[in-house]
């Protein structure tokens, strides 16, 4: 919840759930409301109404969203619902018919209109209350930079295109203008996100825009080069493994952007990948990983996988483990397959029992632990730059270029009580465990 106190203007509470892309949507809504003079309340009791930005990607997310709506209704009584679950308004209204309004994802205008209807805005706007970078829900030193909306893929387990539509890329000058504003406000790290980051500009046929008086194509490699000129960390997330991704690796080796790729491979059995409607040439993927690391040895690769997908046999799962052994990925997340209403995968034969899905997920994560630890051990004894997150009497917690916020590990600095949150620092790595590095500050 976000808090700003005022006794003279209408107050809106806000609950933001889901992925970083939803966080960006929440920030846009909050910025619009603040610009119109609404105050942002940090409590249900103090708010005149509450907006809940939902997630609907898997069943657990739907349940969490419905619970959050119910809590807001119980504590406040006036609730507007938006976000991915909002695309299924029948589900929301069946559970909570008393909500004031329901909109889908990426619907700032519709949310603001609903707020106007149920809580009329002040007569005069208060644009002076808005910082140039807008309202943000992340710490001051990093920000998510969303470059597109929607997705052109039709992965059989996913319903994102039905909720957020096909790919719509933001004009490159808009992206760069926002990035510059964020950096000017003190942001030290830009996390580039979308549903399909690699496809940026495909829908616009890589149209040429302009930034700082020079032409700039609406294409990921060109955007990455431009962002790399801003003097901050630039981290790439949700990178679909197109061949064009290869172009990013030299930029990472040169230090223009962080040597970090978040690539959701999802599986390694060609048969299961075909059923998922994902690229299925596993040998090609392994060869590309080897090539990436030959160009940029410090590259960190994060990926996610699904266990227990319909039709997955013991041999399919063993293929996945063999892939992990060969690929030596740095960071891995795994999800037991969960049927999502409306997903094509629901119609596939041979569903895997729930307990087997979860058992395979746990086996995969246990298998990956040794690999992740070995990948971290290579940093011991090296001097690295970290971005400090928190400092207290017991020391500091930071992140390295290999660690995205909330999903990866940390750098623990026991003697770091003199460091400054939100600033870069030089440290020497002294030890590691499965997820985290340990370090001491350098003079």
Swiss-Prot record:
Binds 2 [4Fe-4S] clusters. One cluster is coordinated with 3 cysteines and an exchangeable S-adenosyl-L-methionine. Keywords: 4Fe-4S, Cytoplasm, Iron, Iron-sulfur, Metal-binding, S-adenosyl-L-methionine, Transferase. InterPro entries: Elp3/MiaA/NifB-like_rSAM, Methylthiotransferase, Methylthiotransferase_CS, Methylthiotransferase_N, Methylthiotransferase_N_sf, NA-bd_OB-fold, Ribosomal_uS12_MeSTrfase_RimO, rSAM. GO terms for cellular component: cytosol. One of its GO terms (molecular function) is protein methylthiotransferase activity. [4Fe-4S] cluster 2 binds at residues 151, 155, 158. Its EC number is 2.8.4.4. Residues 10-120 form the MTTase N-terminal domain. Residues 137-375 form the Radical SAM core domain. Its cofactor is [4Fe-4S] cluster. Signal peptide: none annotated. It is found in: Cytoplasm. PANTHER family: RIBOSOMAL PROTEIN S12 METHYLTHIOTRANSFERASE RIMO, RIBOSOMAL PROTEIN US12 METHYLTHIOTRANSFERASE RIMO. Belongs to the methylthiotransferase family. RimO subfamily. This is Ribosomal protein uS12 methylthiotransferase RimO. It comes from Aromatoleum aromaticum (strain DSM 19018 / LMG 30748 / EbN1) (Azoarcus sp. (strain EbN1)).
